Amino acid sequence: MAGNGSAPDTATHQVRQFDQARAEAAVRELLFAIGEDPDRHGLAETPARVARAYREMFAGLYTDPDSVLNTMFDEEHDELVLVKEIPLYSTCEHHLVSFHGVAHVGYIPGNDGRVTGLSKIARLVDLYAKRPQVQERLTSQIADALVKKLNPRGVIVVVEAEHLCMAMRGVRKPGAVTTTSAVRGLFKTNAASRAEALDLILRK
């Protein structure tokens, strides 16, 4: 579910550790709470499976974002670099169900012309998506991490996603898409640059 939320950090992050045993115990208790028998056939291995799945789904909590953007190239490039349609899967922190969609990430390199690898941008999206999230914060975290590491003249991030907490419960509106954006630097101060980037992002 999209909504306001705060986190301990944006572009900075203290790496945590996953507690497999504690996660398994929590899932077992949840099964008891909904009236199920966690020892019956079909559920006996569920706590371990769910814990392993959560470890993968929340892997972004256990990775330092600075380690992702660790490859730079001196290309003396001074125009927009844009990676579109990056698939993302994240988890709404309000209901712990999925939201999924795509991210479009663009930046104009700084005066030194340094760029990062295109795959690094996709990895950065994946890292921040693999946390308990709200879409607005996810969008800003991606933008702020690029600003911190690349010192670019401008950054623009647009995320489009469908939230299962709106589709399968509550208002039950499957197919509704939420769009969020974060702009930094030149894209925030220069309307023409922002419009050009958005045109490229929205062009199919």
Swiss-Prot record:
One of its GO terms (biological process) is tetrahydrobiopterin biosynthetic process. Keywords: Hydrolase, Metal-binding, One-carbon metabolism, Zinc. It catalyses: GTP + H2O = 7,8-dihydroneopterin 3'-triphosphate + formate + H(+). Its EC number is 3.5.4.16. PROSITE patterns: GTP_CYCLOHYDROL_1_1, GTP_CYCLOHYDROL_1_2. Pfam families: GTP_cyclohydroI. Pathway: Cofactor biosynthesis; 7,8-dihydroneopterin triphosphate biosynthesis; 7,8-dihydroneopterin triphosphate from GTP: step 1/1. Zn(2+) binds at residues 92, 95, 165. InterPro entries: GTP-CH-I_C/QueF, GTP-CH-I_N, GTP_CycHdrlase_I, GTP_CycHdrlase_I_CS, GTP_CycHdrlase_I_dom. GO terms for cellular component: cytoplasm. GO terms for molecular function: GTP binding; GTP cyclohydrolase I activity; zinc ion binding. Belongs to the GTP cyclohydrolase I family. Homomer. This is GTP cyclohydrolase 1. The lineage of its organism: Bacteria, Bacillati, Actinomycetota, Actinomycetes, Mycobacteriales. The gene is folE.
